[in-house]
Amino acid sequence: MARTDDDTWDLATSVGATATMVAAGRARATRDGLIDDPFAEPLVRAVGVDFFTRWAAGELDAADVDVPGAAWGMQRMTDMITARTRYIDAFFAEAGAAGIRQVVILASGLDARAYRLPWPAGTTVFEIDQPRVLEFKAATIAQLGAEPTAPVRAVAVDLRHDWPSALRQAGFDVGRPAAWAAEGLLGFLPPQAQDRLLDNVTALSADGSQLVAEVFANTGASGDALNAAGEKWRRHGLDVALDDLGFPGERNDPASYLQQLGWQPVRTPLNQMLANNGLPLQSTEPGAPFAQNYYCTAVLNKAG
């Protein structure tokens, strides 16, 4: 079913299911000793989507659920999530070392960094997502008896609505630098909403703020790869049409757009991240799926 501009979801449906899929990837990578996210598997189990639970637990293998040699599948997703998790964890460590003590995780989903990263003293973590998502995550982690490693403030609001006001009401200080993460988010926003999000982040950011974002190119080849994987997953009981979850149409390149707003962006291609982590590379043939994906870090210098 195609997305609408004001749709909602839980963690088992629509965009919410992708948050559970990503957490399943983190859980599998944790089992393989590639990252350390002890909360990922319990969160996936609590959501209750059998396919993701079995992948997280190591009960399904790529041979069971993936098309051999395909550009996308559960194992390729897990590889990408491994590289992405390490990259963004390192981003937050560097931001903390630079003295930044406000962290904003946009569309936080089942992200558990507020509980697993060693935040510097004085750090506050703001998590923004739909109310049902935040409530579920908080309740599940509380049942595990876990305590956050920094104060966490849940900002229960859709990013397509007036989230800047909600963030300020939660205690965000626009006069102090912040570290922002847009992980696996931009491609799920309509093109104009992507621009508004980056405009709002800029307006809320003091000089010296830092941003990390994943840039996913919604190309026809990428959509075909997503749909091909989904066909095999349906045989195992998972019915999520990943290509339907994005929004069609031309959109601004995030790094270029951020540069116009006063940020100093640095692009890291997906394959560079995979290579840095010793993981299999994506095809670089012209038009290959995901070949245009990259990760962007940026520092704000309005006076620049």
UniProtKB/Swiss-Prot annotation:
GO process terms (BP)? methylation
The molecular function GO annotations come to: methyltransferase activity
Which EC numbers does the record give?
2.1.1.-
Q: Where on the tree of life does the source sit, at the highest rank?
A: Bacteria
Under the heading InterPro entries, the entry gives: Ppm1/Ppm2/Tcmp, SAM-dependent_MTases_sf, SAM_mthyl_Trfase_ML2640-like
SUPFAM superfamilies registered for this protein in UniProt: S-adenosyl-L-methionine-dependent methyltransferases
Question: Any idea which positions bind S-adenosyl-L-methionine?
Answer: 129, 158-159
Entry keyword set: Methyltransferase, S-adenosyl-L-methionine, Transferase
Q: What does this protein do?
A: Exhibits S-adenosyl-L-methionine-dependent methyltransferase activity.
Similarity comment: family membership: Belongs to the UPF0677 family.
Q: Which NCBIfam families match?
A: mthyl_TIGR00027
Descriptive protein name:
Putative S-adenosyl-L-methionine-dependent methyltransferase MAV_4236
Question: Which lineage ranks, top first, belong to the organism behind this chain?
Answer: Bacteria, Bacillati, Actinomycetota, Actinomycetes, Mycobacteriales
